[in-house]
C-alpha cells in the first residue's frame, strides 16, 4: 500500500505455496501490480523432486487464482541439468497457465546453487540444444507472451553487467533492514552493509562504504581498468568473484580475460567429470545424477 501511494510498481516474487485466494485478493486490494511464480518443471514428480517438497500442484492452483484476479502472471523457471531437457514442455506449461511473461533463467551459481554446482550444471550439449528451442518459442509467442532467456553465466566469454553496475540503479532492503547493492551481496563477507534503522536510504546510497566500494570504474584492477568493456559489464559480478576466488575486487572469473578464468574452468570441468562418472543416472530418470544438498530450516 505504501509503495502504491509512492507511485512504485510492485511485483510479488513467490514460490506461491502459501498464496491463497484471500491473501492474493488482499495484496491486490493493497495495490499489488503483478505476481511471479517459480516453477521447477512441467511434470509433478520431477518438479516436486527438485523443490524437495510437494509444491507443484499448489503452484498450479495459485497461478489460476492470480489469473482469475486479473493480475499479470510471470512464470519463472530456473533451468539446470535435471530439467533443461524438458524445456519444450515447460514452455507449454507456461502457455497453459496463462502467463503474460516467462523467464527461462539458466541457473546462476550463488547461495545453495553454488553449493550444488556439480549437480546443477548442464552439459554444453544440453545448453546447445536448449537455446534454439527458447529462441523459436520467443519468436512464435511474440505479441502474446514476453519471453526472457537468461544466458548461462559459466558458458559465456564475457560476464553479465550485474545489476547494470554496482550501486548504479539497484537497491535492496532485506527483512533485517540491511541495505544491499544486489540481492546476493551478503555473500561478500568483507563488506559491512548499513541498516535502515541507523541510516536513511539516501545516506546509504550516496555515502556508505558498501555502495561506494565497487561503484564506477576507479576500483578496477587490470585487465578491467584499461578494457574497452569496463563500462559495459563493469568488471562482472562482485559476488561471483568473491565466491570463486575469495576476493570481490578481482575481475569476474566468468570473463575470458580474467586472470582467474582458470578457477572457473577447473570448477566446470570437475563438475562435468563428476557427472560423467554417473552417466547412467540422468535427468531422464526424474532426478539429479549427483546428490543434492537441500536448504533446511535451523531453529
Regions found by a protein language model. Name each.
Residues 1-3:
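N-terminal active-site wall of soluble small-molecule enzyme domains
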Amino acid at each position: 500500500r505504501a509503495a502504491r501511494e509512492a507511485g512504485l510498481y510492485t511485483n510479488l516474487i513467490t514460490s506461491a505455496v502459501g498464496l491463497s485466494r484471500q491473501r492474493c485478493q488482499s495484496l491486490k486490494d493493497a495495490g499489488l501490480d503483478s505476481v511471479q511464480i517459480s516453477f521447477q518443471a512441467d511434470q509433478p514428480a520431477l518438479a516436486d523432486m527438485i523443490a524437495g517438497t510437494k509444491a507443484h500442484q499448489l503452484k498450479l492452483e495459485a497461478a489460476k487464482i492470480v489469473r482469475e484476479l486479473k493480475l499479470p502472471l510471470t512464470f519463472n523457471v530456473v533451468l539446470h541439468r535435471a530439467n533443461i531437457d524438458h524445456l519444450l514442455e515447460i514452455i507449454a506449461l507456461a502457455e497453459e497457465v496463462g502467463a503474460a511473461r516467462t523467464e527461462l533463467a539458466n541457473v546462476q551459481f550463488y547461495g545453495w546453487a553454488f553449493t550444488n554446482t556439480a549437480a546443477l550444471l548442464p552439459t554444453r550439449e544440453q545448453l546447445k540444444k536448449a537455446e534454439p528451442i527458447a529462441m523459436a518459442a520467443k519468436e512464435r509467442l511474440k505479441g502474446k507472451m514476453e519471453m526472457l532467456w537468461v544466458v548461462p553465466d559459466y558458458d559465456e566469454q564475457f560476464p553479465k553487467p550485474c545489476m547494470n553496475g554496482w550501486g548504479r540503479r539497484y537497491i535492496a532492503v532485506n527483512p533485517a533492514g540491511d541495505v544491499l547493492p544486489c540481492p546476493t551481496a551478503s555473500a561478500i563477507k568483507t563488506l559491512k552493509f548499513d541498516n535502515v534503522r541507523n541510516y536513511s536510504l539516501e545516506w546509504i546510497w550516496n555515502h556508505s562504504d558498501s555502495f561506494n566500494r565497487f561503484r564506477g570504474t576507479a576500483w578496477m584492477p587490470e585487465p578491467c581498468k584499461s578494457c574497452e568493456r569496463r563500462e559495459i559489464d563493469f568488471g562482472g559480478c562482485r559476488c561471483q568473484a568473491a565466491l570463486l576466488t575469495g576476493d570481490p575486487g578481482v575481475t569476474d572469473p566468468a570473463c575470458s580475460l580474467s586472470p582467474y578464468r582458470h578457477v572457473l574452468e577447473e570448477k566446470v570441468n570437475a563438475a562435468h567429470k563428476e557427472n560423467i562418472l554417473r552417466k547412467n543416472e540422468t535427468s531422464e530418470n526424474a532426478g539429479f545424477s549427483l546428490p543434492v544438498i537441500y536448504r533446511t530450516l535451523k531453529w
